């Protein structure tokens, strides 16, 4: 809440993507990510978040891209924000969130199903479907729940879905990467984003290298 609001004068940001953070930190321990070093999650005050989102809505910003590491790691926080943008939709602004799909529960999926087409887009990090790889990088994903959530979201035809993969993770050879790619492609995302592993200084993977 003490972090100042950067976007008071929108002249310099006209027709641009606005980056916004409603939380810092991540409760998970993915070995390639520096956010895993500090597992605390600090949430911005919701009243302040709503005030700032309303400013973006009033300004008719084309897209607000949330840079929270795992937006839906706190159910109440996510529901409050998703409910607010659904109730105050201006018919123009799109909101982008990075989420863990296997954390989505029935209440969240039902709310997402009510969104105007184009109001929300979701970026979902799968990274790999190789269980040995996921264990090696300390990424605990329920792949069955993830797939079920993506299928449920697709069934409403209202949300643009990005699915992410990382090439170069431990125990991922060409054969297993092809399987991961095919697994993710079969979920029929609107966009499949491929990143390449960067061993970041201070990360768990650097320690293990």
Segments predicted by a language model, with ranges:
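Short, basic, helix/turn surface patches
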Residues: 1-4, 191-193
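Radical SAM [4Fe-4S] cluster-binding motif and immediate context
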Residues: 2-155
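Flexible glycine/acidic-rich beta-alpha junction loops that bind and position SAM and/or redox cofactors
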Residues: 28, 75-76, 132-137, 167-175, ...
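Conserved acidic functional residues
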Residues: 69, 164, 195
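Short, hinge-like loop/turn segments at secondary-structure boundaries
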Residues: 82-83, 180, 209
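Catalytic cores of alpha/beta
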Residues: 108-112, 170-186
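Structural recognition of alpha->loop->beta junctions
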Residues: 114-120, 184-192
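C-terminal EAL-domain catalytic cores of bacterial cyclic di-GMP phosphodiesterases
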Residues: 159-163
